[in-house]
UniProtKB/Swiss-Prot annotation:
Organism: Sulfurimonas denitrificans (strain ATCC 33889 / DSM 1251) (Thiomicrospira denitrificans (strain ATCC 33889 / DSM 1251))
An example Gene Ontology CC term for this record: ribonucleoprotein complex
InterPro entries on file: Ribosomal_bL36, Ribosomal_bL36_sp
Keyword Plastid included in the entry's annotation: no
Similarity comment: Belongs to the bacterial ribosomal protein bL36 family.
Domain of life: Bacteria
Gene Ontology biological-process annotations: translation
The protein's name: Large ribosomal subunit protein bL36
Keyword line: Ribonucleoprotein, Ribosomal protein
UniProt-listed PANTHER family: 50S RIBOSOMAL PROTEIN L36, CHLOROPLASTIC, LARGE RIBOSOMAL SUBUNIT PROTEIN BL36C
Keyword Coiled coil among record annotations: no
Amino acid sequence: MKVRASVKKMCDDCKVVKRKGIVRVICKVKKHKQRQG
């Protein structure tokens, strides 16, 4: 899980989702998991 100021899709499988006001990136590639913070 990377915590970043700006979350971006890193590949075509990445999805940007908003959960409880937190922007997250979910992906089958574990290295691509991110959240905004």
